[in-house]
Amino acid sequence: MNIELKLLNKEIIKEVPEYGTEGSAAVDLRACLSEAEFLSPGECKLIGTGIAINIANPNYAAMILPRSGLGHKKGLVLGNGTGLIDSDYQGELMVSCFNRSQEVIEIEPMMRFAQLVVVPVVQAKFDIVEEFSQRTIRSAGGFGHTGV
C-alpha cells in the first residue's frame, strides 16, 4: 500500500518516517520543534510532526500511539489515548502529549516521541431496529461482566 507523505517542514527530510525492521508494525513520529519543549507533571501539549499524509482509501486509517518505552520509563503518553487519522484528513499530524509522571519531561527537536500504524477499516451500515435479531449470552452485561 502506498501513502502520500508531505513534508511540511524541510528539517524533517533528514528523518523521514520509516519502519525500523521488517516486522515493525508502526513508524516512529518525530517532534518537529525548533527548540526543546518541557512538559510539567500533569501537563498536556500538542506537538507537531512536520508531516501530513494522504491515505486516500476509506478502507484504511492511521492511528497515533505512544512509544512503549517513553510511556513506561518516562511517563510520556498521549493526552487523548489514541489519535485516529481518517483517510481523508490531510493536515499536519499533531500529537497530544501528556506527562503522567512526577518529573518534568523534555521533548527534544526531532525526538522520536510517538508512532503511527496504518490499520484496515470497515465502514458499517447501521440498521435501526426495535429489538435485535438474536440475543447473545452476554446481552446487556456491561463493564466487568466477564469477571474483571
From Swiss-Prot:
InterPro entries in UniProt: dUTPase, dUTPase-like, dUTPase-like_sf, dUTPase_trimeric
Record-listed substrate binding positions: R67, S68, G69, N80, L84, I85, D86, M94
Class of enzymatic activity (EC top level): hydrolase
Domain of life: Bacteria
Pfam assignment, any one: dUTPase
Reactions that this protein is recorded to catalyse: dUTP + H2O = dUMP + diphosphate + H(+)
Example of a GO MF term: dUTP diphosphatase activity
GO terms, biological process: dUMP biosynthetic process; dUTP catabolic process
Cofactor(s) the protein requires to work: Mg(2+)
Keywords carried by this UniProt record: Hydrolase, Magnesium, Metal-binding, Nucleotide metabolism
Pathway linked to the protein: Pyrimidine metabolism; dUMP biosynthesis; dUMP from dCTP (dUTP route): step 2/2
EC nos: 3.6.1.23
Presence of keyword Ribosomal protein: no
NCBIfam families: dut, PRK00601.1
Function as written in the Swiss-Prot or TrEMBL entry: This enzyme is involved in nucleotide metabolism: it produces dUMP, the immediate precursor of thymidine nucleotides and it decreases the intracellular concentration of dUTP so that uracil cannot be incorporated into DNA.
Family: Belongs to the dUTPase family.
Protein name per the record: Deoxyuridine 5'-triphosphate nucleotidohydrolase
Record organism: Francisella philomiragia subsp. philomiragia (strain ATCC 25017 / CCUG 19701 / FSC 153 / O#319-036)
